[in-house]
Amino acid sequence: MKKRIPTLLATMIATALYSQQGLAADLASQCMLGVPSYDRPLVQGDTNDLPVTINADHAKGDYPDDAVFTGSVDIMQGNSRLQADEVQLHQKEAPGQPEPVRTVDALGNVHYDDNQVILKGPKGWANLNTKDTNVWEGDYQMVGRQGRGKADLMKQRGENRYTILDNGSFTSCLPGSDTWSVVGSEIIHDREEQVAEIWNARFKVGPVPIFYSPYLQLPVGDKRRSGFLIPNAKYTTTNYFEFYLPYYWNIAPNMDATITPHYMHRRGNIMWENEFRYLSQAGAGLMELDYLPSDKVYEDEHPNDDSSRRWLFYWNHSGVMDQVWRFNVDYTKVSDPSYFNDFDNKYGSSTDGYATQKFSVGYAVQNFNATVSTKQFQVFSEQNTSSYSAEPQLDVNYYQNDVGPFDTRIYGQAVHFVNTRDDMPEATRVHLEPTINLPLSNNWGSINTEAKLLATHYQQTNLDWYNSRNTTKLDESVNRVMPQFKVDGKMVFERDMEMLAPGYTQTLEPRAQYLYVPYRDQSDIYNYDSSLLQSDYSGLFRDRTYGGLDRIASANQVTTGVTSRIYDDAAVERFNISVGQIYYFTESRTGDDNITWENDDKTGSLVWAGDTYWRISERWGLRGGIQYDTRLDNVATSNSSIEYRRDEDRLVQLNYRYASPEYIQATLPKYYSTAEQYKNGISQVGAVASWPIADRWSIVGAYYYDTNANKQADSMLGVQYSSCCYAIRVGYERKLNGWDNDKQHAVYDNAIGFNIELRGLSSNYGLGTQEMLRSNILPYQNTL
């Protein structure tokens, strides 16, 4: 299991930013200039049996027991080197040992180094047999990486595995800077286990101690280690001052946990955020349980609620066992509809209208698969909490290709729908869908002829309340049988563009599809899981207008479209444009009176869609799309973006997105589409930028403006300073955080965050721009 990037627990030795490009690489190179490297040939294997070479100005001795060397003494064996003004060499026979024990005492300007560490001090001692080394009242410097300090006594033990410091200190800052350090009465650094143990630890900023712990165990490498991670703090208008102190628990090689006490001043309590990760034979998963024992703000706003406890449970699991079994969980549930408005959480957002709870178990072998699942929804709307869950649902697929010239498939589904309200209709639905295809293709085109039968049976219950309030009545037992016929043809033509762009290739890809589905009146079937599908270019060629099975629209239509692409001499797509339309010979209907455009009796060219992408250069890109629906009498949706991206840290993007109110009303559930905040649709223009503004300084910003409401929708500004041993990030965000139904206006939350990252024990020197961009409520999406 991959461990999160370690940060320095409580004393905070480590890093939490990742970037390997742009200025990050420059900063890493600059930092390594102040770090010594091992510049002698590296000797591999056991070096204890290698000869010892001694150079000095003067030498005298009592052979074979003792020798004294003075004047520029230089002793080498393997990768180890000891230098001093004077060295006394002692050699004694040890009982039971085949080789004599050779030790040295060094005096004056003692310098010891190997491929791991450099030790300096006035006095030293070394065992040439074991490489054990002591240096008194000196300092040390790691070789090839950041890390240095001082100690009353520095010891190398266990073939250089352990560095032991008595009354020592550590910092990853380069020489000449002690911005932060950790000191302790004893520090043991285990290189093999990549851990440092510190007794009586004090974390210092400059000369000032700000934190004490009697014992700390710190991760100093990539191995997973239990301990505190770096704390965080911020201020928001929703919760006022907030402080996080995460603790990482390495439970076992296949599981770990992060426990985070999260203090919120305005809430008057600590939320316990508990994340658990695991890896098993059935797959990998993550669980999160967040719990706030009481919330004084919630108590004031909801005096009639029995409890002010706030909680979230999240579980995600995905895995395969024995190559045939599939297990999937996507489960999110919160204590109340306001949870994501009050608390920032990576498993949900204030813009989410619901949370999903889904479990599924699947079985798959060649030509056959089956899945049993349950799906529920927790709706956050205060206007209508009605929602349907599938409890349970069975999906079965059987494929048999190459039956002569045909491919065949049978799809079956059985599902039971239950509503959260006891007065709403419920149903059991059984669907069977046999399909036969005749695929024909060559190197420049293909045509696929398909026929299928859509047979569905409904057994509906609990209809009295609905039928008493609607003129269109639901039937308890309904059978719906619909044949479907489709012919889909594609061609691909290409030509060299030698005249305009040597080495480039252009394609022309026309496509035409005829679809026929006869009309069946479905007004006696309640809509349990169907909604209008978005008609982008690829969506024009779908079989269905609606998702789900409750509404299958009739079709007698031809869809035509064309795509053109341009590839460079490296076969990289530089440009594409697609445009298409649906021409209806007869009106597309379901018989549902709630679908307003079915009363318009429109035919002809009704739906248009287009998409384009242009990679102008390695740094410039443009992407856009538009969908026009004459049934809605307007542009349904559109989006566009243009981006300049020099590297990971330097980018500027302008974007626009639009959704008409008619489209929202047709696609969203009624309790969302009729809400006040959607009455004018969505029309937002935005800008995102990230750029280093000075040496080691970078800035990130995002701004979105709602042109319908003539007000800001969301904004974010972050500034980060990065150095070799620490980084400081300050951020501000103003984001949409719900809708006030009483006052009929949007509610915003303002947040100011402050974060310190300590660096030096890994290769991470990123400027933090990608992290800040992804943290926005409208996250950055790459156009290139």
UniProtKB/Swiss-Prot annotation:
Pfam families: LptD, LptD_N. It is found in: Cell outer membrane. InterPro entries: LipoPS_assembly_LptD (IPR020889), LptD (IPR050218), LptD_C (IPR007543), OstA-like_N (IPR005653). Disruption phenotype: Mutations alter the permeability of the outer membrane resulting in increased sensitivity to detergents, antibiotics and dyes. Depletion leads to filamentation followed by membrane rupture and cell lysis. Contains two intramolecular disulfide bonds. At least one disulfide bond is required for activity, and protein is probably fully oxidized in vivo. Its main location: membrane. Residues 1-24 form the signal peptide. One of its GO terms (biological process) is Gram-negative-bacterium-type cell outer membrane assembly. Disulfide bonds join C31-C724, C173-C725. Keywords: Cell outer membrane, Disulfide bond, Membrane, Signal. It comes from the Bacteria. Belongs to the LptD family. The correct assembly of LptD depends on the thiol:disulfide interchange proteins DsbA and DsbC, the chaperone proteins SurA and Skp, LptE and the chaperone/protease BepA. Incorrectly folded LptD can be degraded by three different proteases, DegP, BepA and YcaL. These proteases act at distinct points in the outer membrane protein assembly. HAMAP family: LPS_assembly_LptD. Contains an N-terminal soluble domain that is likely periplasmic and interacts with LptA, and a C-terminal transmembrane domain, which is predicted to be a beta-barrel and interacts with LptE. Residues 529-538 play a key role in interaction with LptE. NCBIfam families: PRK03761.1 (NF002997). Component of the lipopolysaccharide transport and assembly complex. Interacts with LptE and LptA. May interact with LptE during assembly of LptD by the beta-barrel assembly machine (BAM). Also interacts with LptM, which promotes the efficient assembly of the LptDE translocon by the BAM complex. This is LPS-assembly protein LptD. It comes from Escherichia coli (strain K12).
